[in-house]
Structures are given as C-alpha cells and as structure tokens.
C-alpha cells in the first residue's frame, strides 16, 4: 500500500510552489511547470522522495532513534504538536531557542527546572510564599512550558529532525548540520535543497499540505516503533484520504498521467513473475 497517494497530495495542494519570481534556482529539477505565475512541483518526484524519507525514518526509529519535529509557523504548529504527540516524539512548534541542539546541556538544565516547578506546584511547594513570589514562579513555569514543553522528555539530541519550512527554521537546520544530524524536510520552490538530507518537494505554506506530510513522517515513526517492539505495522496510522475540493481539470490531468506511469512500472515485475511459470516443463503422465 502506498504511503500517500497522488490524489491526497493534489487535494492538499502539495503541488503548489511559490510565485515564479520567488524561487531558488537549485529547485529547478523538482519543478514540473508554472501556471498563472505559480510554480507547480513534480509530484511524481515527491512520491519517490517520500518513500526514501519514510524508509529512513522507520529504520532510524526501529533502531532506537528519535525524531524531533520542528515547525513554528502558524500553518504547521498544530500538526507538528499533534502528530509528534501521537507517536511519542519531541517537538518544537513555538520559538526555536538558539543552541537547542548545539548547547543541549544548558537546555537540559532548563528542562529540569521546568519539571522542578511543576512538581512544586503539584505538591504544594508554592504554599507559604508571597503572592509576588508565586506569580513570578508561575510565569517562569509558563514561559518554560511554552518554549520547551514539547521536548520535556528529550534526554539527548535527536537522531534526526523533521522540519516544515527550512527558510524559517534556518537556525534548526544550521544546528542539525553542525552536529551531523540528518535533516528531513519539505522543500518548497524557494528552499535550498543542498541543506537537506532527505528532501520532500512540496508546499510548506498550506496547512493541509504541511499536515499531510507531517502525518506521513509520524506514520513512519509509528511503524518504526512497532518494528522495534516486534509488532506488525498499524494500517490505521497511514494518512487518510480527505474529501477535499474537486480537482481542477489540469490537476485531474496530472492524476491521470500518474496512473499509467505506476502501471508501467508494475508491469515488468508482473511479467518477470509469470515467466518462470510459463517456461516450466510439463509433467509426464
């Protein structure tokens, strides 16, 4: 079963890039055409790159690794938090703090402080303090939870990072590359593909596109967790096809072109399986 379908991506607007005047020439090889001044991303390539990224994430998690989900733009915040939480992975969906990876020792101390404040609140540690002291401690706890709450259980730097919008999250990309942590990311037409180890060409501005591709990565994590536990993959974790709006004629044409291509790839394999059976000698009576 395909990890994600062409129709799901078309429904989610994954194929829409930026305006033709706002692009990175290095992305030329991932662009199919332009329409009304907007670049159209080649979703056939996207499918191929999704498979590569999916396999990498699954194997990484299956061998005990963790994936940090990063997306602080409004379009990605909700899906980053919900999908990472669903599969038990750390995430950053508010503000990326400089040194979150390269200076993790200091960040880890702040995490311990957050847990200390939460324990104080739950066990009555705030009692006997002045209102001003309680207010200051509460504000400190709220601020720490807002910026670090998603990585509260991250005991060490992650094995890989999933990023929505490498331009906005340039600090996260730079820190990951400095530590040789593999970067998996959506590549919109204004991104630099040289900064990403496992690129997925697609729209990083549309809410539904970011959510779909984040769900794909989360599903790979879920499958890796199950493989680690020796369980079979949960089919329900795969992205579900949304109803979506009716496709435009040119989008339907893209979809119709994708089907024959998939059939053409499958045909040689089917013929190869059938050939040995046809060549087998007849059994004598």
UniProtKB/Swiss-Prot annotation:
Example of a GO MF term: structural constituent of ribosome
Swiss-Prot/TrEMBL GO biological process terms: translation
Bias type Low complexity, positions: 258-285
Keywords: Ribonucleoprotein, Ribosomal protein
InterPro entries on file: Ribosomal_uS2, Ribosomal_uS2_bac/mit/plastid, Ribosomal_uS2_CS, Ribosomal_uS2_flav_dom_sf
Record GO cellular component, one term: cytosolic small ribosomal subunit
Gene3D superfamilies per the UniProt record, alphabetical: Glucose-6-phosphate isomerase like protein, domain 1, Helix hairpin bin
Keyword field contains Oxidoreductase: no
Stretches the record annotates as Disordered: 228-285
Membership in a protein family: Belongs to the universal ribosomal protein uS2 family.
HAMAP family: Ribosomal_uS2_B
NCBIfam families per record: rpsB_bact (TIGR01011)
Protein name: Small ribosomal subunit protein uS2
Gene field: rpsB
